[in-house]
Amino acid sequence: MKILKTLYTATLCAAMAVSTSSCLNSWLDQSPADGIDAETAIKNSDDLANVRTGLYAAVKGNSSLINYYGRLMFVYGDMRGEDIQYEYNGGRGRANFYYYMEYTTADNFTTSTAVWQMPYVVIARANRLIQAAESGNLTDAAEAKATIDQYDAEAKVLRAMALFDLTRIYGKPYTVDQGSSLGVPIATSPLESTEKPSRSTVAQCYEAIEKDLTDAINSNALPKTNEVGYVNLWAAKALQVRVYMTKGEWSKALSVAEDIISNSSYKLWEPSEYVAAWSKSDANHSKEIMFEISINNNTDWTDREGIAYLYADKAGASPGYGDVIVTKDFSDMLTSDPADIRNDILLAAAAGGFDKRKVYINKMPAVNGDVRYSNVPLLRLSEVYLSAAEAAFQAGDKNKAANLLNDIISNRTTDESKQVTSGNITLDRIYIERRKELVGEGQRYFDVMRRGETVTRYTDVNDRGWHDVLSEEARTFNRDSKKALPLIPVGEINANPNIEQNPGY
Protein backbone atom coordinates (compact mmCIF):
# COMPACT_ATOMS: atom_id res chain seq x y z
CA MET A 1 0.00 0.00 0.00
CA LYS A 2 1.32 3.43 -0.90
CA ILE A 3 1.46 6.09 1.78
CA LEU A 4 -0.75 9.17 1.75
CA LYS A 5 1.64 12.01 1.04
CA THR A 6 -0.14 15.33 1.20
CA LEU A 7 3.11 17.20 0.79
CA TYR A 8 1.71 18.96 -2.24
CA THR A 9 3.05 22.26 -3.42
CA ALA A 10 6.04 23.36 -1.43
CA THR A 11 7.37 19.97 -0.42
CA LEU A 12 7.37 18.65 -3.95
CA CYS A 13 8.67 21.91 -5.35
CA ALA A 14 11.50 22.13 -2.85
CA ALA A 15 12.57 18.60 -3.65
CA MET A 16 12.14 18.83 -7.40
CA ALA A 17 13.05 22.51 -7.92
CA VAL A 18 10.03 23.07 -10.12
CA SER A 19 7.58 25.93 -10.20
CA THR A 20 4.97 26.32 -7.49
CA SER A 21 2.09 26.34 -9.93
CA SER A 22 2.97 22.90 -11.24
CA CYS A 23 2.58 21.44 -7.77
CA LEU A 24 -0.72 22.94 -6.70
CA ASN A 25 -3.14 20.09 -7.30
CA SER A 26 -1.71 16.95 -5.80
CA TRP A 27 -3.82 16.56 -2.68
CA LEU A 28 -3.72 12.77 -2.81
CA ASP A 29 -0.35 12.07 -4.41
CA GLN A 30 0.26 8.61 -3.04
CA SER A 31 4.00 8.08 -3.46
CA PRO A 32 6.11 8.60 -0.37
CA ALA A 33 8.94 11.10 -0.66
CA ASP A 34 11.46 8.34 -1.31
CA GLY A 35 9.13 6.36 -3.59
CA ILE A 36 9.25 3.34 -1.29
CA ASP A 37 6.23 1.47 0.04
CA ALA A 38 5.62 1.67 3.78
CA GLU A 39 6.22 -2.04 4.18
CA THR A 40 9.70 -1.65 2.70
CA ALA A 41 10.60 1.71 4.22
CA ILE A 42 9.88 0.94 7.89
CA LYS A 43 11.42 -2.32 9.06
CA ASN A 44 12.23 -1.72 12.73
CA SER A 45 12.04 0.77 15.59
CA ASP A 46 15.05 2.68 14.26
CA ASP A 47 13.21 3.30 11.00
CA LEU A 48 10.16 4.27 13.04
CA ALA A 49 12.29 6.80 14.93
CA ASN A 50 13.19 8.41 11.61
CA VAL A 51 9.51 8.71 10.74
CA ARG A 52 8.93 10.24 14.18
CA THR A 53 11.59 12.84 13.46
CA GLY A 54 9.89 13.68 10.18
CA LEU A 55 6.53 13.92 11.94
CA TYR A 56 7.74 16.56 14.38
CA ALA A 57 9.56 18.33 11.56
CA ALA A 58 6.22 18.71 9.75
CA VAL A 59 4.73 20.47 12.78
CA LYS A 60 7.59 22.96 12.62
CA GLY A 61 8.03 23.27 8.85
CA ASN A 62 10.97 25.15 7.37
CA SER A 63 11.62 28.47 5.67
CA SER A 64 9.56 27.38 2.65
CA LEU A 65 6.83 25.62 4.61
CA ILE A 66 5.56 28.03 7.23
CA ASN A 67 1.83 27.33 7.04
CA TYR A 68 1.49 25.59 10.37
CA TYR A 69 3.30 26.21 13.65
CA GLY A 70 6.37 27.51 11.87
CA ARG A 71 4.49 30.78 11.48
CA LEU A 72 1.00 30.90 10.08
CA MET A 73 -0.90 29.24 12.93
CA PHE A 74 0.23 32.04 15.24
CA VAL A 75 -0.49 34.77 12.70
CA TYR A 76 -3.97 33.40 12.02
CA GLY A 77 -4.81 32.93 15.69
CA ASP A 78 -3.71 36.36 16.86
CA MET A 79 -3.81 38.71 13.87
CA ARG A 80 -7.54 38.08 13.53
CA GLY A 81 -8.09 39.39 17.04
CA GLU A 82 -7.86 42.85 18.60
CA ASP A 83 -4.70 42.48 20.70
CA ILE A 84 -2.19 42.13 17.86
CA GLN A 85 -1.79 44.17 14.69
CA TYR A 86 0.38 44.44 11.63
CA GLU A 87 3.10 47.09 11.90
CA TYR A 88 2.15 48.77 8.64
CA ASN A 89 4.81 51.49 8.81
CA GLY A 90 7.71 49.10 8.55
CA GLY A 91 6.57 45.49 8.41
CA ARG A 92 7.74 43.19 5.65
CA GLY A 93 4.33 41.87 4.57
CA ARG A 94 4.48 38.49 6.31
CA ALA A 95 1.59 39.16 8.69
CA ASN A 96 -0.75 41.50 6.84
CA PHE A 97 -3.08 39.01 5.10
CA TYR A 98 -5.41 38.39 8.04
CA TYR A 99 -5.01 41.94 9.30
CA TYR A 100 -6.47 43.73 6.29
CA MET A 101 -8.85 40.86 5.41
CA GLU A 102 -8.94 41.95 1.77
CA TYR A 103 -9.15 38.43 0.37
CA THR A 104 -12.11 37.84 -1.92
CA THR A 105 -11.72 34.44 -3.60
CA ALA A 106 -10.16 31.05 -2.93
CA ASP A 107 -7.29 32.05 -5.22
CA ASN A 108 -6.10 34.37 -2.44
CA PHE A 109 -5.52 31.41 -0.13
CA THR A 110 -2.19 29.79 -0.92
CA THR A 111 0.55 27.83 0.80
CA SER A 112 1.82 31.09 2.29
CA THR A 113 -1.56 32.32 3.54
CA ALA A 114 -3.65 29.22 4.34
CA VAL A 115 -3.20 26.78 7.22
CA TRP A 116 -3.93 23.62 5.23
CA GLN A 117 -0.90 22.02 3.63
CA MET A 118 1.35 21.25 6.58
CA PRO A 119 -1.34 20.01 9.00
CA TYR A 120 -2.19 17.39 6.38
CA VAL A 121 1.48 16.54 6.05
CA VAL A 122 1.46 15.96 9.82
CA ILE A 123 -1.59 13.72 9.47
CA ALA A 124 -0.05 11.80 6.58
CA ARG A 125 3.18 11.16 8.45
CA ALA A 126 1.30 10.24 11.61
CA ASN A 127 -0.77 7.74 9.62
CA ARG A 128 2.38 6.22 8.21
CA LEU A 129 3.94 5.85 11.66
CA ILE A 130 0.78 4.49 13.28
CA GLN A 131 0.23 1.92 10.54
CA ALA A 132 3.79 0.64 10.84
CA ALA A 133 3.77 0.65 14.64
CA GLU A 134 0.54 -1.32 14.84
CA SER A 135 1.26 -3.71 11.97
CA GLY A 136 3.15 -6.21 14.10
CA ASN A 137 5.67 -6.52 11.27
CA LEU A 138 8.60 -4.60 12.73
CA THR A 139 11.55 -6.91 13.20
CA ASP A 140 12.11 -5.80 16.81
CA ALA A 141 8.42 -5.52 17.74
CA ALA A 142 8.83 -7.53 20.93
CA GLU A 143 12.06 -6.15 22.37
CA ALA A 144 11.29 -2.54 21.39
CA LYS A 145 7.60 -2.63 22.32
CA ALA A 146 7.75 0.24 24.81
CA THR A 147 9.47 2.53 22.33
CA ILE A 148 7.16 1.56 19.48
CA ASP A 149 4.08 2.10 21.65
CA GLN A 150 5.37 5.50 22.73
CA TYR A 151 5.94 6.66 19.15
CA ASP A 152 2.51 5.34 18.20
CA ALA A 153 0.86 7.33 21.00
CA GLU A 154 2.79 10.48 20.13
CA ALA A 155 1.67 10.20 16.52
CA LYS A 156 -1.96 9.98 17.62
CA VAL A 157 -1.58 13.13 19.71
CA LEU A 158 -0.08 15.06 16.80
CA ARG A 159 -2.66 13.69 14.37
CA ALA A 160 -5.36 14.86 16.77
CA MET A 161 -3.74 18.27 17.08
CA ALA A 162 -3.54 18.74 13.30
CA LEU A 163 -7.15 17.68 12.73
CA PHE A 164 -8.30 19.86 15.62
CA ASP A 165 -6.54 22.90 14.21
CA LEU A 166 -7.93 22.32 10.72
CA THR A 167 -11.43 21.80 12.10
CA ARG A 168 -11.48 24.98 14.18
CA ILE A 169 -10.13 27.01 11.27
CA TYR A 170 -12.35 25.77 8.43
CA GLY A 171 -15.43 24.59 10.33
CA LYS A 172 -17.96 26.58 12.29
CA PRO A 173 -17.49 26.48 16.07
CA TYR A 174 -18.95 23.31 17.55
CA THR A 175 -21.19 25.33 19.87
CA VAL A 176 -22.98 27.01 16.94
CA ASP A 177 -24.80 23.88 15.75
CA GLN A 178 -23.35 21.04 17.83
CA GLY A 179 -21.01 20.16 15.01
CA SER A 180 -23.56 19.48 12.28
CA SER A 181 -21.86 21.74 9.73
CA LEU A 182 -18.87 20.85 7.57
CA GLY A 183 -15.43 20.33 9.07
CA VAL A 184 -12.54 18.96 7.01
CA PRO A 185 -11.62 15.64 5.37
CA ILE A 186 -10.52 12.98 7.84
CA ALA A 187 -7.72 10.53 7.07
CA THR A 188 -6.91 7.99 9.78
CA SER A 189 -4.98 5.60 7.56
CA PRO A 190 -2.92 5.78 4.37
CA LEU A 191 -5.21 6.24 1.38
CA GLU A 192 -5.23 4.68 -2.05
CA SER A 193 -4.77 6.95 -5.05
CA THR A 194 -8.42 6.61 -6.02
CA GLU A 195 -9.67 7.83 -2.65
CA LYS A 196 -10.70 11.46 -2.52
CA PRO A 197 -12.41 12.02 0.84
CA SER A 198 -15.09 14.64 1.26
CA ARG A 199 -15.42 16.91 4.26
CA SER A 200 -16.70 15.27 7.40
CA THR A 201 -18.90 17.18 9.80
CA VAL A 202 -17.37 19.13 12.65
CA ALA A 203 -18.87 16.58 15.06
CA GLN A 204 -17.25 13.69 13.17
CA CYS A 205 -13.93 15.52 13.23
CA TYR A 206 -14.15 15.98 16.99
CA GLU A 207 -15.05 12.33 17.41
CA ALA A 208 -11.83 11.38 15.61
CA ILE A 209 -9.81 13.97 17.57
CA GLU A 210 -11.09 12.78 20.92
CA LYS A 211 -10.56 9.13 20.03
CA ASP A 212 -6.92 9.73 19.15
CA LEU A 213 -6.29 11.67 22.35
CA THR A 214 -8.12 9.17 24.53
CA ASP A 215 -6.34 6.22 22.93
CA ALA A 216 -2.95 7.89 23.35
CA ILE A 217 -3.58 8.87 26.96
CA ASN A 218 -5.04 5.50 27.94
CA SER A 219 -2.23 3.58 26.26
CA ASN A 220 0.07 4.29 29.23
CA ALA A 221 2.81 4.63 26.62
CA LEU A 222 3.32 8.39 26.84
CA PRO A 223 6.06 9.44 29.27
CA LYS A 224 5.23 11.71 32.19
CA THR A 225 8.65 13.34 32.10
CA ASN A 226 9.57 16.26 29.88
CA GLU A 227 11.63 15.81 26.71
CA VAL A 228 12.03 19.13 24.95
CA GLY A 229 10.38 19.12 21.55
CA TYR A 230 8.21 16.03 22.10
CA VAL A 231 4.74 15.49 23.51
CA ASN A 232 4.28 13.64 26.77
CA LEU A 233 1.23 12.56 28.77
CA TRP A 234 0.61 16.00 30.23
CA ALA A 235 0.90 17.76 26.89
CA ALA A 236 -1.66 15.33 25.48
CA LYS A 237 -3.99 16.15 28.35
CA ALA A 238 -3.42 19.89 27.91
CA LEU A 239 -4.47 19.52 24.28
CA GLN A 240 -7.48 17.53 25.47
CA VAL A 241 -8.44 20.46 27.72
CA ARG A 242 -8.24 22.80 24.73
CA VAL A 243 -10.53 20.48 22.75
CA TYR A 244 -13.11 20.26 25.54
CA MET A 245 -13.07 24.04 25.98
CA THR A 246 -13.71 24.52 22.28
CA LYS A 247 -16.73 22.22 22.52
CA GLY A 248 -18.03 23.91 25.67
CA GLU A 249 -17.73 20.70 27.69
CA TRP A 250 -16.88 22.42 30.94
CA SER A 251 -16.93 19.50 33.36
CA LYS A 252 -14.61 17.43 31.18
CA ALA A 253 -12.25 20.35 30.66
CA LEU A 254 -12.12 21.10 34.38
CA SER A 255 -11.53 17.48 35.35
CA VAL A 256 -8.57 17.04 33.01
CA ALA A 257 -7.14 20.45 33.86
CA GLU A 258 -7.24 19.72 37.58
CA ASP A 259 -5.53 16.39 36.95
CA ILE A 260 -2.68 18.23 35.22
CA ILE A 261 -2.45 20.89 37.93
CA SER A 262 -2.48 18.37 40.78
CA ASN A 263 -0.47 15.49 39.38
CA SER A 264 2.02 16.77 36.83
CA SER A 265 5.44 18.15 37.70
CA TYR A 266 4.75 21.44 35.91
CA LYS A 267 4.44 24.62 37.97
CA LEU A 268 3.57 28.21 37.15
CA TRP A 269 6.44 30.60 36.71
CA GLU A 270 6.78 32.96 39.65
CA PRO A 271 7.06 36.73 39.07
CA SER A 272 10.82 36.67 39.58
CA GLU A 273 11.15 33.90 36.98
CA TYR A 274 8.65 34.98 34.35
CA VAL A 275 10.62 37.16 31.96
CA ALA A 276 13.84 35.15 31.91
CA ALA A 277 12.05 31.79 31.72
CA TRP A 278 10.97 32.36 28.13
CA SER A 279 14.57 31.78 27.09
CA LYS A 280 15.21 28.13 26.36
CA SER A 281 18.56 28.37 28.13
CA ASP A 282 16.97 29.51 31.40
CA ALA A 283 16.87 26.97 34.23
CA ASN A 284 13.12 27.51 34.71
CA HIS A 285 12.16 27.34 31.05
CA SER A 286 10.67 23.84 31.17
CA LYS A 287 8.95 24.44 34.50
CA GLU A 288 5.79 25.68 32.77
CA ILE A 289 6.19 24.92 29.05
CA MET A 290 4.62 21.55 28.33
CA PHE A 291 5.29 21.25 24.60
CA GLU A 292 7.36 23.40 22.29
CA ILE A 293 8.99 23.26 18.90
CA SER A 294 12.67 22.69 19.43
CA ILE A 295 15.15 24.56 17.24
CA ASN A 296 18.62 23.05 17.43
CA ASN A 297 20.59 24.46 14.51
CA ASN A 298 20.28 26.15 11.14
CA THR A 299 19.26 22.92 9.43
CA ASP A 300 16.00 22.54 11.35
CA TRP A 301 14.81 26.12 11.76
CA THR A 302 12.36 28.29 9.84
CA ASP A 303 15.07 30.92 9.35
CA ARG A 304 13.79 34.43 8.62
CA GLU A 305 10.31 33.15 7.76
CA GLY A 306 9.50 31.82 11.24
CA ILE A 307 7.19 33.43 13.78
CA ALA A 308 10.04 34.55 16.06
CA TYR A 309 11.51 36.64 13.24
CA LEU A 310 8.16 38.35 12.65
CA TYR A 311 7.91 39.25 16.33
CA ALA A 312 11.40 40.76 16.58
CA ASP A 313 11.90 44.51 16.13
CA LYS A 314 13.58 45.19 12.80
CA ALA A 315 15.80 47.81 14.46
CA GLY A 316 16.35 45.91 17.69
CA ALA A 317 19.46 44.35 19.15
CA SER A 318 18.33 40.96 17.78
CA PRO A 319 16.59 42.13 14.61
CA GLY A 320 13.76 40.51 12.72
CA TYR A 321 11.08 41.72 10.34
CA GLY A 322 9.06 43.55 12.98
CA ASP A 323 5.75 42.67 11.34
CA VAL A 324 3.81 42.14 14.57
CA ILE A 325 3.13 44.51 17.46
CA VAL A 326 0.52 44.69 20.20
CA THR A 327 -2.33 47.15 19.70
CA LYS A 328 -2.74 50.32 21.70
CA ASP A 329 -5.89 48.88 23.28
CA PHE A 330 -3.92 45.87 24.49
CA SER A 331 -1.13 48.12 25.73
CA ASP A 332 -3.68 50.19 27.64
CA MET A 333 -5.08 47.04 29.23
CA LEU A 334 -1.70 45.65 30.26
CA THR A 335 -0.14 48.90 31.49
CA SER A 336 -3.19 49.63 33.65
CA ASP A 337 -1.36 47.48 36.22
CA PRO A 338 2.26 48.69 36.41
CA ALA A 339 3.02 45.87 38.85
CA ASP A 340 2.16 43.19 36.27
CA ILE A 341 5.37 41.39 35.28
CA ARG A 342 3.91 40.73 31.83
CA ASN A 343 4.66 44.35 30.97
CA ASP A 344 8.28 43.24 30.79
CA ILE A 345 7.70 40.54 28.21
CA LEU A 346 7.21 43.37 25.72
CA LEU A 347 10.03 45.47 24.27
CA ALA A 348 9.98 49.10 23.18
CA ALA A 349 10.68 49.90 19.54
CA ALA A 350 14.35 50.76 19.11
CA ALA A 351 13.44 53.49 16.64
CA GLY A 352 10.91 55.03 19.01
CA GLY A 353 7.27 55.78 18.32
CA PHE A 354 4.14 54.18 19.75
CA ASP A 355 4.09 56.78 22.54
CA LYS A 356 7.37 55.24 23.74
CA ARG A 357 5.49 52.14 24.87
CA LYS A 358 6.58 48.53 24.70
CA VAL A 359 5.03 46.89 21.64
CA TYR A 360 7.18 43.96 20.49
CA ILE A 361 6.46 40.52 22.00
CA ASN A 362 9.56 38.84 23.41
CA LYS A 363 8.24 35.35 24.16
CA MET A 364 10.71 33.82 21.72
CA PRO A 365 13.86 35.65 22.79
CA ALA A 366 17.13 35.57 20.93
CA VAL A 367 19.69 32.86 21.56
CA ASN A 368 23.20 34.28 21.27
CA GLY A 369 21.75 37.34 19.60
CA ASP A 370 19.62 35.48 17.04
CA VAL A 371 15.87 34.95 17.44
CA ARG A 372 15.88 32.24 14.79
CA TYR A 373 17.30 29.81 17.35
CA SER A 374 14.50 30.33 19.86
CA ASN A 375 12.16 27.46 20.65
CA VAL A 376 8.46 28.00 19.90
CA PRO A 377 6.01 27.32 22.79
CA LEU A 378 2.79 25.48 21.89
CA LEU A 379 1.31 24.37 25.23
CA ARG A 380 1.80 26.00 28.62
CA LEU A 381 0.50 25.35 32.12
CA SER A 382 -0.84 28.92 32.33
CA GLU A 383 -3.39 28.10 29.64
CA VAL A 384 -4.47 25.04 31.63
CA TYR A 385 -5.11 27.21 34.72
CA LEU A 386 -7.03 29.80 32.72
CA SER A 387 -9.13 27.13 31.04
CA ALA A 388 -9.81 25.52 34.41
CA ALA A 389 -10.95 28.86 35.85
CA GLU A 390 -13.28 29.48 32.91
CA ALA A 391 -14.63 25.93 32.99
CA ALA A 392 -15.23 26.10 36.75
CA PHE A 393 -17.10 29.38 36.36
CA GLN A 394 -19.21 28.00 33.53
CA ALA A 395 -19.93 24.91 35.63
CA GLY A 396 -21.21 27.11 38.45
CA ASP A 397 -18.31 26.87 40.91
CA LYS A 398 -17.27 30.50 41.32
CA ASN A 399 -15.19 29.79 44.41
CA LYS A 400 -13.01 27.30 42.53
CA ALA A 401 -12.87 29.64 39.53
CA ALA A 402 -11.63 32.48 41.74
CA ASN A 403 -8.97 30.31 43.36
CA LEU A 404 -7.68 29.11 40.00
CA LEU A 405 -7.62 32.59 38.51
CA ASN A 406 -5.85 33.95 41.59
CA ASP A 407 -3.12 31.36 41.08
CA ILE A 408 -2.38 33.11 37.79
CA ILE A 409 -2.86 36.65 39.08
CA SER A 410 -0.65 36.19 42.15
CA ASN A 411 2.14 34.90 39.93
CA ARG A 412 1.89 37.81 37.52
CA THR A 413 1.36 40.92 39.66
CA THR A 414 2.40 42.02 43.13
CA ASP A 415 -0.73 44.17 43.40
CA GLU A 416 -2.95 42.05 45.65
CA SER A 417 -5.96 44.25 44.90
CA LYS A 418 -6.08 42.62 41.46
CA GLN A 419 -7.08 39.28 42.94
CA VAL A 420 -10.71 38.18 42.74
CA THR A 421 -13.26 36.58 45.03
CA SER A 422 -16.20 34.29 44.43
CA GLY A 423 -18.36 37.38 44.82
CA ASN A 424 -16.78 39.57 42.17
CA ILE A 425 -15.30 37.16 39.63
CA THR A 426 -16.83 37.41 36.16
CA LEU A 427 -16.26 35.72 32.83
CA ASP A 428 -15.01 39.02 31.44
CA ARG A 429 -12.35 39.14 34.16
CA ILE A 430 -11.22 35.63 33.25
CA TYR A 431 -11.17 36.55 29.56
CA ILE A 432 -9.04 39.64 30.22
CA GLU A 433 -6.54 37.61 32.19
CA ARG A 434 -6.43 35.07 29.38
CA ARG A 435 -5.73 37.77 26.82
CA LYS A 436 -2.93 39.23 28.93
CA GLU A 437 -1.31 35.86 29.49
CA LEU A 438 -1.59 34.28 26.05
CA VAL A 439 -0.95 37.24 23.76
CA GLY A 440 1.20 36.25 20.81
CA GLU A 441 0.59 32.53 21.33
CA GLY A 442 -2.05 32.18 18.62
CA GLN A 443 -5.12 31.72 20.82
CA ARG A 444 -7.20 34.90 20.72
CA TYR A 445 -9.29 34.39 17.57
CA PHE A 446 -10.09 30.82 18.52
CA ASP A 447 -11.37 32.07 21.88
CA VAL A 448 -13.48 34.65 20.06
CA MET A 449 -14.97 31.98 17.82
CA ARG A 450 -15.77 29.44 20.52
CA ARG A 451 -17.31 32.06 22.83
CA GLY A 452 -19.20 34.01 20.18
CA GLU A 453 -17.46 37.29 21.01
CA THR A 454 -17.08 40.29 18.72
CA VAL A 455 -13.67 41.60 17.70
CA THR A 456 -13.58 45.39 17.63
CA ARG A 457 -10.22 46.71 16.48
CA TYR A 458 -11.45 50.30 16.43
CA THR A 459 -14.66 52.18 15.74
CA ASP A 460 -13.51 55.56 14.41
CA VAL A 461 -10.51 57.85 14.12
CA ASN A 462 -10.68 58.71 17.80
CA ASP A 463 -9.89 55.18 19.00
CA ARG A 464 -7.83 53.97 16.05
CA GLY A 465 -4.68 53.84 18.13
CA TRP A 466 -1.76 52.48 16.07
CA HIS A 467 -3.96 50.76 13.49
CA ASP A 468 -3.80 51.41 9.79
CA VAL A 469 -7.03 52.51 8.11
CA LEU A 470 -9.14 49.36 7.82
CA SER A 471 -12.31 48.52 5.94
CA GLU A 472 -15.49 48.28 7.95
CA GLU A 473 -15.50 44.47 7.73
CA ALA A 474 -11.93 44.38 9.10
CA ARG A 475 -12.66 46.75 11.98
CA THR A 476 -15.46 44.79 13.63
CA PHE A 477 -16.49 41.19 13.09
CA ASN A 478 -17.64 38.00 14.81
CA ARG A 479 -18.25 34.36 13.99
CA ASP A 480 -21.35 35.25 11.97
CA SER A 481 -19.44 37.63 9.70
CA LYS A 482 -19.00 36.54 6.10
CA LYS A 483 -15.22 36.30 6.46
CA ALA A 484 -15.26 34.50 9.80
CA LEU A 485 -14.00 31.34 8.07
CA PRO A 486 -11.24 31.25 5.45
CA LEU A 487 -11.71 29.61 2.07
CA ILE A 488 -10.03 26.32 1.25
CA PRO A 489 -7.19 26.88 -1.24
CA VAL A 490 -8.50 26.50 -4.78
CA GLY A 491 -5.71 24.07 -5.66
CA GLU A 492 -7.02 21.62 -3.08
CA ILE A 493 -10.55 21.87 -4.47
CA ASN A 494 -9.20 21.24 -7.97
CA ALA A 495 -7.21 18.23 -6.78
CA ASN A 496 -10.14 16.76 -4.89
CA PRO A 497 -13.54 17.83 -6.27
CA ASN A 498 -15.24 16.03 -3.38
CA ILE A 499 -14.11 18.81 -1.03
CA GLU A 500 -16.95 21.30 -0.75
CA GLN A 501 -15.81 24.92 -0.50
CA ASN A 502 -16.78 27.22 2.36
CA PRO A 503 -19.32 29.93 1.46
CA GLY A 504 -17.70 32.61 -0.68
CA TYR A 505 -17.37 36.29 0.08
Predicted regions and their residues:
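Conserved, well-structured interaction surfaces
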Residues: 92-170, 218-222, 371-376, 395, ...
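Membrane-proximal, proline-rich intrinsically disordered regions
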Residues: 23-78, 311, 315, 321, ...
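Short, surface-exposed recognition loops and adjoining beta-strand edges that mediate ligand/DNA contacts
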Residues: 38-39, 66-87, 166, 171-180, ...
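Sec-dependent bacterial lipoprotein signal peptides
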Residues: 1-22
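Extended ligand-binding clefts on enzyme/binding-domain cores
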Residues: 45, 52, 60-61, 204, ...
